[in-house]
Amino acid sequence: KTALITGATSGIGKATAIVLAKNNFNVVLCGRREDRLQELYEELSQYTSVHTLTFDVRNKEAVAAQIGSLPEAFATIDVLINNAGNAHGLDPIQNGSEDDWDAMIDINVKGLLYVSKAIIPQMVARKSGHIINIGSTAAKEVYPNGNVYCASKHAVDALNQGMRMDLNPFGIRVGAIHPGMVATEFSEVRFKGDTERAANVYKGFTPLQPEDIADIIHFVITRPY
């Protein structure tokens, strides 16, 4: 089977790519950072067939063109893992940055839609496929100053439920995984490179690791139909 993973260059996406490659999935790695994609390509090619696509999920033309360019050996996507996502800032709504809001909505919501739109038609035609949308506990509960990020993840949860309703008649499985605190670049990106502030997010407890979520994803997509 072939799995396409967005946001594959770090964190949960990278960990998932490694787990799937070691468990006989062919993998299509998608991300913005070509150097990191190449490193991961070289690492995983010893286990399985690997293809990389470089694009930003916010760019719908690039998404369509890149996914449309997949060679025949990778063109049939059995599993789509919508993992690309981000948080920017942690400010009360009155102090929020419009640029931060745009980034979160464009990546977390619209980017997920653009990638899904490029792949779902082939799943419908085959009447098979599995989509995993990576949400967050923020999809279930809003926390102080999380306003727009939490809204974007609530949207992912709603889209996940809507996709399931729409695609179930075609034999396509759709599910979401909503991680809590996971030790990734997430907080460093949120705080724009402030590593000290990012480290404080995990102070006083042991966060999950990306591999923990990757194991859950692998478990879910390998359950018998």
Model-identified regions with their sequence ranges:
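Conserved glycine-rich Rossmann-like NAD(P)H-binding loop of the short-chain dehydrogenase/reductase
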Residues: 25-39
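The beta1-alpha1 cofactor-binding region of Rossmann-like NAD(H)/NADP(H)-dependent oxidoreductases
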Residues: 54-65, 98
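Substrate-binding pocket helix/loop in short-chain dehydrogenase/reductase
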Residues: 91-93, 100-103
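Conserved glycine-rich cofactor-binding loop
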Residues: 9-10
